[in-house]
Amino acid sequence: MSISQKRASEIVDALRRGTVPRTSLDAFCVGLERFEPAVDADLDAVAAGRGVFKAVRGDYGCGKTFFTRWLADRARKRGFVTSEVQISETETPLHKLETVYRRLMERLATADTPEGALRTIVDGWFHVLEEDVLAEGVAPEDTERLVTRTTALLEQRLAGVTNHAPLFAAAIRGYRRAAVAGDRATADGVLAWAAGQPHVAAQVKKSAGIKGDLDHFGALGFLQGVLTMLRDAGHAGLLVVLDEVETIQRVRSDARDKSLNALRQLIDEVEGGRFPGLFLAITGTPTFFDGPQGVRRLEPLAQRLHVDFQTDSRFDNPRAVQLRLPPFDLDRLCSVGQKIRDIFRGTAVAPDRVAARCDDAYIRRLAEAVTGHLGGKVGIAPRIFLKKLVGDVLDRIDQFPDFDPTRDYRLTVNDTEMTRVERQASGAKDLDGIELEL
């Protein structure tokens, strides 16, 4: 597919840093075509007002983060707001829903705003309300009447939110009052409080008629309020990704059980219709879904997420509640490398030299070499392979006319450039894999 030079540069820059790009992932994805019809059907269902839940299952290196960012990119192109929250035992524990909500708000993204889009959504909603008032015949120059009618319409639209999250509704009213009055500092503080931020000044909260901080029980009500606003503002819905949920296996047993119960509650609420317009996705390893320290600890959750994966993976059902991502193989790794090389050419000073010196045969040699350095495990190779391809090979070919990777480049992979999970996965797996000096 053809993409702009700006998009190509964003992809290349992210891979050079060893991270997954956030946009245009369909330009170089390989092997996800089988999921497209089911994913699009789910997005259509959410846009029509349903709630949808999906669990994405795969070992490290299968591309879970890539899949969810591909899904988010696809959703934003359809008018969705998206948010990716990385679950961790210290910064974002799953059992503290108020913290999950705060992270979710911090990472709200639209097609035009890559992060922190809450203000854009709220202001966009106010604009829609004003447009509706103008459509009634109120003159644009009649500022006083426009504000009065818009405020009245805001109260009508907030009626449903007030029932389940009165403090959220109060915060939105307070934000609008401060914004209309030109008090930006108060408006910012009130909106931060509505986004779950602690330590908002008492005077700011008092001006909006709110008090205290968001707690575990109020978080889901606030999420309902956000959904109401963004859908009323013309957005198709909200996609929330909870990434690396398997990390809850490493916390204390009481926190683990609370986290599993919080996940069960979220799934029940989504499927029970509390969150129309919400697509909730989680990612986890097979051990999380099948092991004794994961989903199986909570029987109701295990029942909801159970899918039989004993059958041939070619016939996995993309409509099931749990999706199994296939592991990377060498051919798939090479295909991705070829696509990245072609995207890089769109940003290169010497695109013809890039194509000539990094041909398909060299890409396969590099893929085999990286995989060999990682103990032959193709599944953990994609991130490092693409980082080496872009930063060590393609950049040098483009900048140095004399550079020939077959002659001038020797692959090295150091522990310092690998993630903890990559180091663990590439190490010895059993006693036979440990070398002893005798």
Label each region the model flagged.
Residues M1-V52, L146, D402-L438:
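A short, basic N-terminal segment
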Residues S2, R7, A187-C358:
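The catalytic "switch" region of P-loop NTPases
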Residues L25-E33, G61, L94, V161, ...:
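Conserved phosphate/pyrophosphate-binding and hydrolysis machinery centered on Walker-type P-loop NTPases
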Residues A38, W70-R74, K96-R107, K258-A262, ...:
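Alpha-helical scaffold elements adjacent to nucleotide-binding pockets in ATP/GTP-utilizing enzyme cores
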Residues A55, C62, F66-A233, R396-P401:
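P-loop NTPase nucleotide-binding core
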Residues F66, E130-V133, I248-R252, T412-E422:
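Eukaryote-specific, cytoplasm-facing alpha-helical/coiled-coil scaffolding segments in long proteins
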Residues R176-A192, Q197, Q203, S313-R319, ...:
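C-terminal alpha-helical "lid" subdomain
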